[in-house]
Curated annotation (Swiss-Prot):
GO terms for biological process: methylation. The gene is ubiG. It catalyses: a 3-demethylubiquinol + S-adenosyl-L-methionine = a ubiquinol + S-adenosyl-L-homocysteine + H(+); a 3-(all-trans-polyprenyl)benzene-1,2-diol + S-adenosyl-L-methionine = a 2-methoxy-6-(all-trans-polyprenyl)phenol + S-adenosyl-L-homocysteine + H(+). O-methyltransferase that catalyzes the 2 O-methylation steps in the ubiquinone biosynthetic pathway. It comes from Burkholderia ambifaria (strain MC40-6). The lineage of its organism: Bacteria, Pseudomonadati, Pseudomonadota, Betaproteobacteria, Burkholderiales. Keywords: Methyltransferase, S-adenosyl-L-methionine, Transferase, Ubiquinone biosynthesis. HAMAP family: UbiG (MF_00472). It comes from the Bacteria. Pfam families: Methyltransf_23. One of its GO terms (molecular function) is 2-polyprenyl-6-hydroxyphenol methylase activity. Belongs to the methyltransferase superfamily. UbiG/COQ3 family. This is Ubiquinone biosynthesis O-methyltransferase. InterPro entries: SAM-dependent_MTases_sf, UbiG_MeTrfase. S-adenosyl-L-methionine binds at residues 36, 55, 76, 120. CDD domains: AdoMet_MTases (cd02440).
C-alpha cells in the first residue's frame, strides 16, 4: 500500500502550475528555501554529493541543491508537480532527475545510494511518517545525512500555522495543513530511534513578519528542522 493520502496528493496536484510563482500559494516555500538550503549545505557540503529530495513537488529545493553542485534526484507521487518540475528544469538549465515513485519503493530499489536525503515539509502530509523516516534511513549511505522539516503539534503552532497563516494572513490556502498530523519533535525522534540514524541537530524556523523573512532560531514551537546522520 502506498504511503500517501489521495486527498493530499490531489490538493497539491491542483496547485502544480503555481509552484514557481513566487507570489502565489507557494510563496512561503520560496521565502523559506534559502534558509533551509543554507542549513543543509552547512552540514552536508552539497557540492559533488549525490542527493535525493523526497516529496520534491515542483522542484524548488531540488534545483537549489543542484545549483550548489549536487547530483540530485527528486521524487514525488504527484505527476502534475513533476511535470512542472521537469519543465522548469529545462527552462533554468539546472539538471535534476525526477521520478514518480514512493520513497519506500525507491528504498527497496536503491538502498544505501545517497549521500544526502531531504524530506522537507512532507511528513505532516502522509499517513505514516514513521514509514518515510525508515525509508530515508535505508536510502542514505552509511555516514550520510538525512534532513527533515515539519510542524510541531501544540496550541501555538495551531494558532500560527493554521489559523494565522491560512485564515488571517492568508499566506497559505485554507486546508493546506491538517493539525492532527503535525508531529512533535519527541515523536519524530522516536521514529529516528527505530532506524540506523541519529539526530545531530534540531533547529527552529521563525518567521519575521516585519521583514517578511524566515530565519533559523532555537524556537521549535512551530516549524522545525532535524539533521540526522546514518552510522558509518
Amino acid at each position: 500500500m502506498t504511503n500517501a493520502d489521495p486527498h493530499e496528493l490531489q490538493k497539491f496536484s491542483d496547485l502544480a502550475h503555481r509552484w514557481w510563482d513566487p507570489n502565489a500559494e507557494f510563496k512561503p516555500l520560496h521565502e523559506l528555501n534559502p534558509v533551509r538550503l543554507g542549513w543543509i549545505d552547512a552540514h552536508a557540503h552539497l557540492a559533488g554529493k549525490r542527493a535525493l529530495d523526497i516529496g520534491c513537488g515542483g522542484g524548488i529545493l531540488s534545483e537549489s541543491m543542484a545549483g550548489l553542485g549536487a547530483q540530485v534526484k527528486g521524487i514525488d507521487l504527484s505527476t502534475e508537480a513533476l511535470g512542472v518540475a521537469d519543465l522548469h528544469s529545462l527552462e533554468s538549465g539546472v539538471t535534476v532527475d525526477y521520478e514518480a515513485i514512493a520513497a519506500e519503493a525507491l528504498a527497496e530499489r536503491e538502498p544505501g545510494t545517497y549521500d544526502v536525503v531531504t524530506c522537507m515539509e512532507m511528513l505532516e502530509h502522509v499517513p505514516s511518517p514513521a514509514g518515510i523516516v525508515s525509508a530515508c534511513a535505508t536510502l542514505v549511505k552509511p555516514g550520510g545525512w538525512v534532513f527533515f522539516s515539519t510542524l510541531n503539534r501544540n496550541l501555538k503552532s495551531y494558532l500560527f500555522a493554521v489559523i494565522g497563516a491560512e485564515y488571517i494572513a492568508r499566506m497559505l490556502p485554507k486546508g493546506t495543513h491538517d493539525y492532527a498530523r503535525f508531529i512533535r519533535p519527541s515523536e519524530l525522534a522516536s521514529f529516528v530511534r527505530g532506524t540506523d540514524l541519529h539526530i545531530v541537530e534540531i533547529k527552529g524556523i521563525t518567521y519575521h513578519p516585519i521583514g517578511k523573512r524566515f530565519a533559523l532560531s532555537n524556537d521549535t514551537d512551530i516549524n522545525y528542522l532535524v539533521a540526522c546522520r546514518r552510522g558509518a
